[in-house]
């Protein structure tokens, strides 16, 4: 698969997820990425730095224009810690942890985030408003409740299965309560 094709597919999926999730400036978008799955391998076994770089660089270009922060999830060897900009970690009072990702501990996406972000750091936990999962990496633990599945028109980037999540405010109060309309549930 050509890197150009991966870039185009990534761009299409991320733009759709942003549109459907109604993410706003200052909010957080999580990326879970298995470059191994993108190139047709098994998660964690065939990592590709080139794929990680093209995916992360493409997403950062889109998010930076909108003022949305990117958080890049690492693999289970790093307890699914995330690379974020130091500015975000300070702003949200996130605990910074001391680890540098490698190709097989953190993965290609995290290495790319360290290359392309201005001042990257690792944090252990985050609560993001939306995200995309390329290769079934399980990003749900980092998405705010209540999570709403999003189905992008492309179901794969390369050979990796793609899913996405947005979030909405919890509905409380039961049958007597009235609720405001929100963008995510309009189509429901």
Swiss-Prot record:
Family: Belongs to the UPF0340 family.
Pfam families: DUF436 (PF04260)
Coiled coil (UniProt feature): none
NCBIfam families hit by this protein: TIGR01440 family protein
Name assigned to this protein: UPF0340 protein SSU05_0314
Organism: Streptococcus suis (strain 05ZYH33)
Domain of life: Bacteria
């Amino acid at each position: 698969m050509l890197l150009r094709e991966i870039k185009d597919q990534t761009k299409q999926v991320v733009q759709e997820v942003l549109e459907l999730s109604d993410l706003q400036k200052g909010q957080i978008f999580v990326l879970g990425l298995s470059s191994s799955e993108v190139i047709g391998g098994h998660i964690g076994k065939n990592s590709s730095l080139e794929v990680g770089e093209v995916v992360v660089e493409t997403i950062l270009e889109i998010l930076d224009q909108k003022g949305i922060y990117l958080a890049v999830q690492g693999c289970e060897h790093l307890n699914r810690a995330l690379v974020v900009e130091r500015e975000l970690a300070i702003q949200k009072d996130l605990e910074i942890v001391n680890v540098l990702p490698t190709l097989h501990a953190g993965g290609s996406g995290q290495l790319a985030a360290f290359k392309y972000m201005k001042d990257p750091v690792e944090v252990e936990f985050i609560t993001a408003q939306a995200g995309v999962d390329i290769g079934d990496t399980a990003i749900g633990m980092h998405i705010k409740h209540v999570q709403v599945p999003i189905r992008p028109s492309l179901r794969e980037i390369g050979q990796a299965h793609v899913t996405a999540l947005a979030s909405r405010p919890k509905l409380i109060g039961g049958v007597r309560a009235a609720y405001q309309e929100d963008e995510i549930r309009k189509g429901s």
